[in-house]
Amino acid sequence: MVSTSDFKTGLTIEVDGQIYVILDFLHSKTARSGALINTRLRNLRTKNIQEITFKSGDKVERAIIDRIKMQYLYASGDTHVFMNMETYEQIEVDKSQIEYELNFLYESLEVEINFYGTEIIGVNLPEKLVLEVKETVPGVKGDTKTNAMKDAYLASGYLVKVPMFIETGEKIIVNTTEGTYVSRA
């Protein structure tokens, strides 16, 4: 059990059968009702962000999340196969659990898969990945005065905004958390 006074960003807790990670929290004192802790939490199953207020001194169950290094192997219908890097055991993850992550996955990419017991909670991608631009319109010199952006499609079909000088076939660095262009590779 974890007391609300021990809350910190990144802590995983279980509330009403749901598993949350604390995104941020704020202690606030009121004259009559005592201290309250306002938290912003992400549900690890649904990915929704929720705000929950706890009373000071409340205790919640700590959720132990195991992070295991895996390698993405291939897609098989609506499932995607990953291999444990230590035991070589293969697991299948349903497409619905990793819809956003599919925009950046490619064969042999090393990721971390989060487990709550035997349940797969999510996939952690590296923060930045080098990916190839499959299609973009050519930029014309003198098009703009400022740093204008254009659309570029990655191999997965994911659309990212890139500067005008990026061409089809170039490798770029993409921030997987925000899904944005960082720089040329």
Curated annotation (Swiss-Prot):
It comes from the Bacteria. Signal peptide: none annotated. The keyword Protease does not apply. Pathway: Protein biosynthesis; polypeptide chain elongation. Keywords: Cytoplasm, Elongation factor, Protein biosynthesis. GO terms for cellular component: cytoplasm. GO terms for biological process: peptide biosynthetic process. InterPro entries: Elong-fact-P_C, NA-bd_OB-fold, Rib_uL2_dom2, Transl_elong_fac_P/YeiP, Transl_elong_KOW-like, Transl_elong_P/YeiP_cen, Transl_elong_P/YeiP_CS, Transl_elongation_fac_P. Belongs to the elongation factor P family. Involved in peptide bond synthesis. Stimulates efficient translation and peptide-bond synthesis on native or reconstituted 70S ribosomes in vitro. Probably functions indirectly by altering the affinity of the ribosome for aminoacyl-tRNA, thus increasing their reactivity as acceptors for peptidyl transferase. This is Elongation factor P. It comes from Acholeplasma laidlawii (strain PG-8A).
